[in-house]
Amino acid sequence: MLIFIPILIFVALVIVGAGVKIVPQGYQWTVERFGRYTKTLQPGLSLVVPFMDRIGRKINMMEQVLDIPSQEVISKDNANVTIDAVCFIQVIDAPRAAYEVSNLELAIINLTMTNIRTVLGSMELDEMLSQRDSINSRLLRIVDEATNPWGIKVTRIEIRDVRPPAELISSMNAQMKAERTKRAYILEAEGIRQAEILKAEGEKQSQILKAEGERQSAFLQAEARERSAEAEARATKMVSEAIASGDIQAVNYFVAQKYTEALQQIGSSSNSKVVMMPLEASSLMGSIAGIAELVKDSANKRTQP
């Protein structure tokens, strides 16, 4: 009897070991009994029926990255374009992912490639290059809906690269260079135009200010002439009144002042060869005496009845 005890202990340990399962974090295991799915083991320690239950599939529940192989797509405008993409998936239902499709990753890759050809084949090359976000969103919606029966959640689909043919790339580069040159010429012409406009505006303002200054100067000159004329008229009036009243001194002062001004104007002449000599004193006195006689005659006429 004692010899069978170690054997029984060993058998018990084997049975316990066959019935105890430890599932790592991030995984779920399916359990099959006689080839039929019965339950799903969650992460941690779990028990199964020894020799009757077995582990069917070990499903990775973490988000996974599937590299979509490069493929050529013919665009709507008949351009052969090489497309490179990547797909992010996560299993949300382990039993369906294990038993609804035979090769999950291969099925998702083929499904994604097919939809890439469908979506991008309906677009022109310019749209492929400029609307990548829209393409990603459209692919995500289509592929995620198609993988729902498999218990898969497609989180992202990214178009990593869109490569046109080499000759088309050269043509596009030449077109871009021509476009940049065109924009440079346009900017240069616009700068010259703005400079000419500013120059014209400056000249316009200068002419306005110049005209305003000339107008102000003319106004001041006219005002000065008007004042001079008024002063001349007042002086003439005063002389007339002095002659009428017989004031010889006022007449003499007026005549002497005009004589002096005339000499100053003649002396300031640019012709240095002209030498002006003042009138003789006797002639000047004779002129004054003649004016005095006129004043006396005028006074006598006023006193006569």
UniProtKB/Swiss-Prot annotation:
All ranges on the Cytoplasmic side of the membrane: 24-305
UniProt keyword list: Cell inner membrane, Cell membrane, Membrane, Transmembrane, Transmembrane helix
One GO location term (cellular component): plasma membrane
Location(s), subcellular: Cell inner membrane
Topological category with respect to the lipid bilayer: Single-pass type I membrane protein
GO molecular function, one term: identical protein binding
Ranges of the Periplasmic topological domain: 1-2
Keyword Transmembrane helix (UniProt): yes
Entry-linked PROSITE patterns: BAND_7
Keyword Transmembrane helix attached: yes
Transmembrane segments: 3-23
Pfam families referenced in this protein's UniProt entry, alphabetically: Band_7
Disruption of the gene: reported phenotype: No visible phenotype.
Function: Identified as a multi-copy suppressor of an FtsH/HtpX protease double disruption mutant. May play a role in the quality control of integral membrane proteins.
Family: Belongs to the band 7/mec-2 family.
Subunit: Forms oligomers. Probably interacts weakly with FtsH.
Identification of the protein by name: Protein QmcA
Organism: Escherichia coli (strain K12)
Phylogenetic placement of the source organism: Bacteria, Pseudomonadati, Pseudomonadota, Gammaproteobacteria, Enterobacterales
Gene name of the encoded protein: qmcA
